[in-house]
Swiss-Prot record:
It is found in: Nucleus; Cytoplasm. The gene is JMJD7. The keyword Plastid does not apply. This is Bifunctional peptidase and (3S)-lysyl hydroxylase JMJD7. It catalyses: L-lysyl-[protein] + 2-oxoglutarate + O2 = (3S)-3-hydroxy-L-lysyl-[protein] + succinate + CO2. One of its GO terms (biological process) is protein hydroxylation. It comes from the Eukaryota. Fe cation binds at H178, D180, H277. Its EC number is 1.14.11.63, 3.4.-.-. Residues 128-307 form the JmjC domain. PANTHER family: BIFUNCTIONAL PEPTIDASE AND (3S)-LYSYL HYDROXYLASE JMJD7, HYPOXIA-INDUCIBLE FACTOR 1 ALPHA INHIBITOR-RELATED.
Length: 316
């Protein structure tokens, strides 16, 4: 009887993503031709937890005309920034039986630009991706070129962003599939970002496993050493590559339906909290994003319930 009840729960979980998709998940990421009003943004996008791409949202930013690799070289080239370095472009990702975190180096931005332009070489793949508001903390000289927040979003959400992050890296740098507890406004200033999404309702089809955390260490010879972080707890992470999923190992993922979009220069993506996302980029893509903490309300509680049931039922 207990097994029958458990199978009934599994059946409901398998059917839930399709039901949610029919009710509230778009078939493609919609476009807006201009920034929404605070009311429109909150009512039509934040409340229903739906992504959108907003055109003409950055037109008033000087950065849109000024930011380029030559401009960075002239204005902040001598500034040292934190750079994630990995052998294959995957930072904070599952590699083998480890959750691998990048080696972190402090490098002059001019050297990063040299690598991006093919003037210099460095072992591995470089990505300026340190979060925790690396734009104001590491590159404050660039702040006059953009707004410190997104006014209509700040008004709609009733708060200021927790972090303003700067992103610059090689085309080989990839962000593995994951979710965040932030309302994310992702602004591409130059180049393109390629996103793959899953709504939170796809959680029953998205596997998680526990991994020993480890960090890449760059040796003097230019090779990478894996160092286990023995003092840290195991990390739950998604082992699956959505671009080449191992369906023999994770057959349930075949029932998930991803959305894909490309965010181009001058466009802003609203990525709702709890949406799973995987990110690629063009070479030397320049982007800034604003993280607004989500409301930990009933919507969050329902997702936690879905997550817990997925784990308890053995679908994970």
């Amino acid at each position: 009887m207990a097994e029958a009840a458990l199978e009934a729960v599994r059946s409901e979980l398998r059917e839930f993503p399709a039901a949610a998709r029919e009710l509230c998940v778009p078939l493609a990421v919609p476009y807006l031709d201009k920034p929404p009003t605070p009311l429109h943004f909150y009512r039509d996008w934040v409340c229903p937890n739906r992504p959108c791409i907003i055109r003409n949202a950055l037109q008033h930013w000087p950065a849109l005309q000024k930011w380029s690799l030559p401009y960075f070289r002239a204005t902040v080239g001598s500034t040292e920034v934190s750079v994630a370095v990995t052998p294959d472009g995957y930072a904070d990702a599952v590699r083998g039986d480890r959750f691998m975190m990048p080696a972190e180096r402090r490098l002059p931005l001019s050297f990063v630009l040299d690598v991006l332009e093919g003037r210099a070489q460095h072992p591995g793949v470089l990505y300026v991706q340190k979060q925790c508001s690396n734009l104001p903390s590491e590159l404050p000289q660039l702040l006059p070129d953009l707004e410190s927040h997104v006014p209509w979003a700040s008004e709609a959400l009733g708060k200021m962003p927790d972090a303003v992050n700067f992103w610059l890296g090689e085309a080989a740098a990839v962000t593995s599939l994951h979710k965040d507890h932030y309302e994310n406004l992702y602004c591409v200033v130059s180049g393109e970002k390629h996103f793959l999404f899953h709504p939170p309702s796809d959680r029953p089809f998205i596997p998680y496993e526990l991994y020993t955390p480890a960090t890449y260490q760059l040796t003097e010879e230019g090779t990478f050493k894996v160092v286990d972080e023995e003092a840290m707890e195991k990390v739950p992470w998604i082992p699956l590559d959505p671009l080449a999923p191992d369906l023999a190992r994770y057959p349930s993922y075949s029932q998930a339906q991803a959305l894909r979009c490309t965010v181009r220069a001058g466009e802003m993506l609203y990525l709702p909290a709890l949406w799973f996302h995987h990110v690629q980029q063009s070479q030397g893509c320049i982007a800034v994003n604003f993280w607004y903490d989500m409301e930990y309300d009933l919507k969050y509680s329902y997702f936690q319930l879905l997550d817990s049931l997925t784990k308890a039922s053995g679908l994970d």
